[in-house]
């Protein structure tokens, strides 16, 4: 093996999404990630690996079938490591591990008390999360300027449970939230075409299935209605990659994604890789 260049990479994203959970939740937010990567050549191709930090912030409104509306804010911050092997044949493998903390708050004026009256109540919650992903794909050159990338990914996230005490007119009731596990499988394809030495456009389609994603809670030992995002979603993406003009310039990827199914909405991202 022989050492190659290092790189600093970053990603910024944001959007507005609706999650259909038996009822539904609307979420608006943004996320940031930045890390350092090192590339090492090997007999099969090239291995890239490195650490990263991540941060995200959002606001949400949830609507339950019983007419209960709640509003809140959430943020997360964590660290992770990632690795990707790109083989000379076009086949690649990738994976990542993440760990961090998520803080959230919730407020509603629609909860029903024992006297059957709507009351104003709120709570704050904080818990750890961890996650991992594995992926495999193959990049095939269709002609001199066009490539196809067919891939499959498995993504897992676990958020620890928490016990929260209702504030306001919630009368100090304790909600015990179970841990939440999300396991998603995604298969997709992306076709990219180089329009010049510096510019490449791409379009992609993907199918995603959430196997779990159920959020359970108990109050006074009784289970409450459990929202779940189990089910299918579809993704359509468009983007443009701008290659560096000079030796010290970054590669910039600008993308737009549209979702339908269990997840509905629009997101966008700007990613960069600065090699040195």
How does the language model describe each region?
Residues 1-143, 147, 253-271:
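Outer membrane beta-barrel translocator domains of Type V secretion systems
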Residues 23-24, 63-71, 103-126, 160-181, ...:
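Solvent-exposed, glycine/polar-rich loop segments of beta-barrel outer-membrane systems
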Residues 80, 142, 167, 171-276:
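Outer membrane beta-barrel transmembrane domains
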Residues 138, 148, 153-161:
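Solvent-exposed flexible segments
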Residues 53-54, 156, 188-190:
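Predominantly extracellular/luminal carbohydrate-interaction, adhesion, and secreted-enzyme modules
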């Amino acid at each position: 093996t022989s050492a190659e260049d290092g790189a600093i990479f970053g990603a910024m994203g944001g959007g507005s999404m609706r999650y259909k959970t038996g009822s539904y939740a609307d979420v608006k937010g943004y996320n940031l990630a930045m890390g350092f990567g090192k590339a090492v050549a090997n007999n099969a191709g090239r291995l890239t690996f490195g650490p990263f930090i991540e941060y995200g912030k959002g606001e949400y409104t949830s609507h339950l079938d019983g007419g209960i509306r709640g509003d809140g804010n959430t943020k997360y911050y964590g660290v992770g490591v990632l690795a990707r092997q790109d083989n000379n044949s076009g086949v690649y493998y990738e994976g990542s591990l993440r760990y961090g903390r998520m803080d959230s708050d919730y407020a509603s004026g629609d909860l029903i008390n024992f006297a059957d009256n709507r009351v104003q109540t709120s709570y704050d919650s904080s818990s750890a999360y961890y996650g991992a992903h594995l992926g495999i794909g193959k990049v095939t050159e269709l002609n001199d300027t066009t490539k196809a990338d067919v891939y499959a990914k498995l993504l897992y996230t676990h958020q620890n449970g928490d016990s929260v005490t209702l504030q306001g007119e919630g009368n100090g009731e304790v909600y015990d939230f179970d841990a939440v596990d999300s396991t998603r499988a995604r298969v997709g394809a992306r076709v990219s075409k180089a329009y010049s030495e510096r510019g490449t456009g791409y379009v992609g389609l993907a199918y995603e299935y959430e196997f779990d994603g159920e959020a359970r809670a108990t109050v006074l030992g009784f289970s409450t209605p459990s929202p779940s995002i189990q089910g299918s979603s579809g993704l359509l993406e468009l983007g443009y990659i701008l290659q560096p003009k000079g030796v010290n310039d970054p590669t910039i990827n600008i993308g737009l994604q549209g979702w339908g199914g269990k997840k509905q909405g629009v997101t966008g991202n700007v990613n960069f890789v600065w090699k040195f």
